[in-house]
Curated annotation (Swiss-Prot):
Gene3D superfamilies: Jelly Rolls, pectin degrading enzyme 5-keto 4- deoxyuronate isomerase, domain 1. The gene is kduI. Catalyzes the isomerization of 5-dehydro-4-deoxy-D-glucuronate to 3-deoxy-D-glycero-2,5-hexodiulosonate. Binds 1 zinc ion per subunit. This is 4-deoxy-L-threo-5-hexosulose-uronate ketol-isomerase. It comes from Paraburkholderia phytofirmans (strain DSM 17436 / LMG 22146 / PsJN) (Burkholderia phytofirmans). The keyword Nucleotide-binding does not apply. InterPro entries: KduI (IPR007045), KduI/IolB_isomerase (IPR021120), KduI_N (IPR027449), RmlC-like_jellyroll (IPR014710), RmlC_Cupin_sf (IPR011051). Belongs to the KduI family. The lineage of its organism: Bacteria, Pseudomonadati, Pseudomonadota, Betaproteobacteria, Burkholderiales.
Amino acid sequence: MEVRQAINSDYAKTLDTDGLRKAFLVDQVFERDALKLTYSHIDRIIVGGVMPVARAVEVPSSLGKSIGVSYLLERRELGAINIGGDGWVDVDGTRHTVRNEEAIYIGQGTQAIAFGSDDAARPAKFYLNCAPAHTSYPTRTISLAQASPQTLGDPATSNRRTIYKFIVPEVLPTCQLSMGMTKLEPGSLWNTMPCHTHERRMEVYFYFNVADDAAVFHMMGEPNETRHILVHNEQAVISPSWSIHSGVGTRAYTFIWGMVGENQVFGDMDHIAVRDLR
């Protein structure tokens, strides 16, 4: 598991392209038949992915030792969204089907977790967010139809999109983790513009459905000190609470957002007018 230290805003604005990418970009989320994780000191979130192809992939109990516990979810909760083929997740001996564009929430205290695919020719790809937790809530799967949808934007501003809120208080209880998926309509390129920050939560964006010859320019930094990170398919960007988080693609794309922090109020944002950005 790779560890990333927290970076403050004064230091971040001194970084060059390579420095920004090393600090905030997770450039490989999936690896065949492996669990890949990145641990951020920012609100102690763990992000990563698992792609079971030839075999099921278990979360090793030894992983807990790297965070000072006996097993990963002894003091944590986990959310996963499947962006690949249909698959399943075994949670303490109970198998849960998780199809494409479906999610699963796994509560604190779960000891045995394994991920699998229904078809090795079209493997599941489970994108994961894991956060500290203080109590245990039930494991549950969430389909796209069960997610809370919100359509925003306009074709005239190239930002027509639908936000599917999978792991949010109006759908199911969690300690602090929130996750969802935003799908841009064809011809729309911008996400989250006008942009915002939220001092009370950090966020991670995971971009996918990005064409091989396309890219997304992810905007970050303080509103008066903006920077960008060029992102390709199936890459993630860690966004501290002091940073804006927005993006524009050369084509439409989809991304998963995950938040942890003080609260779970989706609308608790500090909005920034486009004219005030620098």
